Design a protein with these regions (language model features):
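Walker A (P-loop) ATP-phosphate-binding motif of ABC ATPase nucleotide-binding domains
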Residues: 5
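Hydrophobic anchor at the beta1->P-loop junction of P-loop NTPases
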Residues: 8
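P-loop (Walker A) phosphate-binding loop of NTP-binding proteins
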Residues: 11
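Conserved lysine of the Walker
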Residues: 16
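Conserved substrate/cofactor phosphate-moiety recognition/catalytic segment
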Residues: 21-65, 112
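Glycine-rich phosphate-binding loop used to anchor ATP phosphates in small-molecule kinases
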Residues: 53-94, 101
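Conserved phosphate-donor/acceptor-positioning beta-strand/loop module used by diverse small-molecule
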Residues: 92-112
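Small-molecule kinase domains that catalyze NTP-dependent phosphoryl transfer to phosphate-bearing small molecules
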Residues: 118-160
Length: 170
């Protein structure tokens, strides 16, 4: 087993943290939720429903990349919405693969609203539309895969995610 860097990506409410934690546990990888690396100013901005700009994101992405770089086998939950964000992470941690959790806006809006009510998560429904606008799907040349989480059960999503990780582990 060599280096293994996995980024579970997608818009808010897609299940990134749950899936990344499951992968970490099942494959003995270190885990971090990329949200935990956001500076307080960015969290405050998102809590107010203000989308982050690229300028807000670059320092955060650098922290995510550094975290991956320092660990031989790790998984991170990180939105990684744009190709240039993913390119930056790959430049810092070569060989990083991306698992994109995808679902329509309508499905995720209900999840985000519930999470906001139940858990008080900082990313509310106001951010969802801007994240969908920013989202650039994985390119054909980007290592990784896409999982449709709109109708699959959490167990099914995890099974597919683990199959992807195993197939991508070099």
């Amino acid at each position: 087993m060599g280096l293994m860097h996995v980024v579970v990506m997608g818009v808010t409410g897609s299940g990134k943290t749950t899936v990344a934690k499951g992968i970490a546990q099942a494959r003995q990888l270190e885990f971090i939720d990329g949200d935990d690396l956001h500076p307080a100013a960015s969290v405050a901005k998102m809590s107010a429903g203000t989308p982050l700009t690229d300028e807000d994101r670059w320092p955060w992405l650098d922290l995510v990349g550094e975290w991956l770089q320092e660990r031989p086998r790790a998984v991170v939950a990180c939105s990684a919405l744009k190709r240039e964000y993913r390119d930056r992470l790959r430049a810092m941690a070569p060989g990083t693969v991306f698992i994109h959790l995808a679902a329509p806006h309508s499905v995720l809006a209900a999840r985000v609203e519930k999470r906001l009510t139940d858990e008080g998560h900082f990313a509310g429904p106001d951010l969802l539309a801007s994240q969908f606008e920013a989202l650039q799907p994985l390119g054909f040349d980007e290592p990784g895969g896409v999982i449709d989480v709109s109708t699959a059960s959490p167990t099914e999503v995890m099974e597919v995610a683990l199959e992807l990780v195993d197939a991508l582990d070099v």
